[in-house]
Amino acid sequence: MSSAWEAVRALASGFATTFVHLFRKPVTEEYPEVKRALPARTRAVIVLTRDPDGGERCVACYLCSAVCPVSCISMQAAEREDGRRHAAWFRINFARCIYCGLCEEACPTSAIQLTPFFETCERDILKLVYEKEDLLVDHQGKDKEYNFYKYAGVTTDVGGKGEHVQEDEPVDLRSNLP
């Protein structure tokens, strides 16, 4: 008899919960009209940023494409007249991108940055393949004063290895053997 009474009590408790929720106002947000507040660290669409001088930051080092778990980033490196590398073309397939942010972490020049913009819905899947021209923005992104090309990426003819500022002399590996 005790177990029957507990079953009736549990059933009545469930009905009471349902009865209370029956008179509450439904919480429905109409998405396109009412945007949800996103967290500060939201990662979504990738952009390519520029230097404070206005030049492209990407040096086509292929680190972003190597670290990408879904292989959605592809590019081709080229060299400018002054000896600096740049991406001749840069392509991201957002149909495959999982917005993990590994490409942003791997980028040594802070060229790739993830923005909180996430509304990239398209009916044609080919429109989700973004080229370099679609990804380049006219600002520095999160790192306003960072200028990778100020020192790096420029060939210098000032002495040999180990003779530059803040550079150690080369180590002879054979002399370090035990």
From Swiss-Prot:
Top-level lineage group: Bacteria
Higher taxonomy: Bacteria, Pseudomonadati, Thermodesulfobacteriota, Syntrophobacteria, Syntrophobacterales
Cofactor binding, per record: Binds 2 [4Fe-4S] clusters per subunit.
Function of the protein: NDH-1 shuttles electrons from NADH, via FMN and iron-sulfur (Fe-S) centers, to quinones in the respiratory chain. The immediate electron acceptor for the enzyme in this species is believed to be ubiquinone. Couples the redox reaction to proton translocation (for every two electrons transferred, four hydrogen ions are translocated across the cytoplasmic membrane), and thus conserves the redox energy in a proton gradient.
Catalysis performed (reactions): a quinone + NADH + 5 H(+)(in) = a quinol + NAD(+) + 4 H(+)(out)
Amino acids binding [4Fe-4S] cluster 2: C68, C97, C100, C103
Gene (UniProt): nuoI2
Keyword terms, alphabetized: 4Fe-4S, Cell inner membrane, Cell membrane, Iron, Iron-sulfur, Membrane, Metal-binding, NAD, Quinone, Repeat, Translocase, Ubiquinone
Self-association and partners: NDH-1 is composed of 14 different subunits. Subunits NuoA, H, J, K, L, M, N constitute the membrane sector of the complex.
Family to which this protein belongs: Belongs to the complex I 23 kDa subunit family.
Cofactor(s), by name: [4Fe-4S] cluster
GO function terms (MF aspect): 4 iron, 4 sulfur cluster binding; iron ion binding; NADH:ubiquinone reductase (non-electrogenic) activity; quinone binding
EC identifiers of the protein: 7.1.1.-
Protein's recorded name: NADH-quinone oxidoreductase subunit I 2
GO cellular component, one term: plasma membrane
Classification via InterPro entries: 4Fe4S_Fe-S-bd (IPR017896), 4Fe4S_Fe_S_CS (IPR017900), NADH_quinone_OxRdtase_chainI (IPR010226)
Keyword NAD: yes
Positions of [4Fe-4S] cluster 1 binding: C58, C61, C64, C107
Biological process, per Gene Ontology: aerobic respiration
